[in-house]
Amino acid sequence: MQLPPALCARLAAGPGAAEPLPVERDPAAGAAPFRFVARPVRFPREHQFFEDGDVQRHLYLQDVIMQVADVPEKPRVPAFACQVAGCCQVFDALDDYEHHYHTLHGNVCSFCKRAFPSGHLLDAHILEWHDSLFQILSERQDMYQCLVEGCTEKFKTSRDRKDHMVRMHLYPADFRFDKPKKSRSPASAEAPGDSGERSEGEAMEICSEPVAASPAPAGERRIYRHRIPSTICFGQGAARGFKSNKKKTKQC
């Protein structure tokens, strides 16, 4: 398609040309009834032209403010306790109870009763803490999986996993990733047995013959305060139980 010469000249002249393009009209149509020329019109802010827009804007802002101010209240119900055995939490809103249940009772280890915020952490805990084959397999291959759900990386040790989470997932370095296992030394392992035997022996000695009470150290003599009246005496060979404080009058 070939463009008119005037249009080609207009395009070649660039944006600086201000002359309008010629419009060819059909001679049979006659002269144009009107001629439209665009010109800017400025209205003041309080002009009637903006009245409808101001009303709509005011209603819109009022509706937004009402929605922000009127925070929906949680449906209140009679206070009820958590249904899990051993939990004494009391709630008066269903949302609070659902949050409590999913946080503390939704993912609980059946072995040690520890609660976890997600099923992924619960599975990792059971695998690392309660699986007897985990330690054997960890010596041959990477078994410590990343604690971030969706990450499939596995590592040789828990320290390597922590470095990965700090470096790749931007976790804080002092974040408590996993609770370290407490290693019991041989001395501490033998201590309960010795103490058990000692306590059993002491119990047998106590049953056979009474053990004298150890005397109080010097300077720390115990002071006992009894609320029993001095006129009442207990024990074998004691004076009569009720003794009068009145002195006997001697008869001349």
Curated annotation (Swiss-Prot):
One of its GO terms (molecular function) is zinc ion binding. It is found in: Nucleus. GO terms for cellular component: nucleus. Belongs to the krueppel C2H2-type zinc-finger protein family. InterPro entries: ZNF511, Znf_C2H2_sf, Znf_C2H2_type. Its main location: nucleus. It comes from Homo sapiens (Human). The lineage of its organism: Eukaryota, Metazoa, Chordata, Craniata, Vertebrata. This is Zinc finger protein 511. Keywords: DNA-binding, Metal-binding, Methylation, Nucleus, Repeat, Transcription, Transcription regulation, Zinc, Zinc-finger. The keyword Transcription applies. A zinc finger (C2H2-type) spans 80-105, 107-130, 144-169. Residues 177-221 are annotated as: Disordered.
